[in-house]
């Protein structure tokens, strides 16, 4: 099977070439344009995944109008090192070290998490992934969710 993939930041599409003709693959039947898969991933508390318009619908159904419950969790302090000041006639001073308290605030009442711009993270080599309900997802895993679905849709048509 020969596939061409447009893996865009907002939407993705796939075309199949059978040796004679090129045709678009239906990726998201619920989308206004079913040959486009919006770059949305919804992961719920059971780690079930929805992609594209189904992710948006799931998010709206589960998260709209619900009560938010914020929880603050303290993390380990981080050390920050900055360059020292340059004083005329005295030369460079030593670097300045200080510690900063870090915390995260989480909506513990959330039913799931909607990821909207995961492809944008591909250009940042420091971004390794995200934690969703105590499970770490690497960027590779999140991208694979979309690519595998696109391939499977193409194989079914």
What are these regions (language model features)?
Residues 1-24:
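Gly/Thr-rich phosphate-binding beta-strand-loop-beta motif of the actin/hexokinase/Hsp70
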Residues 27-157:
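Phosphate-binding loop and its immediate beta->loop->alpha context
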């Amino acid at each position: 099977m020969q596939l061409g993939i447009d893996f865009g930041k907002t939407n993705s599409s796939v075309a199949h070439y059978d040796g004679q003709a090129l045709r678009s693959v239906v990726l998201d039947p619920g989308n206004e344009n079913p040959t486009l898969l919006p770059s949305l991933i919804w992961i719920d508390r059971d780690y079930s995944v929805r992609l594209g318009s189904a992710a948006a619908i799931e998010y709206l159904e589960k998260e709209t109008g619900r009560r938010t419950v914020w929880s603050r969790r303290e993390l380990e302090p981080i050390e920050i090192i900055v360059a020292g000041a340059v004083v005329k006639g005295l030369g460079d001073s030593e670097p300045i070290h200080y510690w900063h308290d870090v915390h995260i605030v989480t909506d513990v009442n959330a039913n799931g998490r909607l990821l909207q711009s995961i492809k944008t993270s591909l250009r940042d080599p420091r971004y390794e992934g995200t934690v969703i309900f105590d499970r770490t997802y690497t960027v590779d895993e999140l991208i694979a969710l979309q690519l595998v679905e696109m391939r499977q849709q193409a194989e079914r048509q």
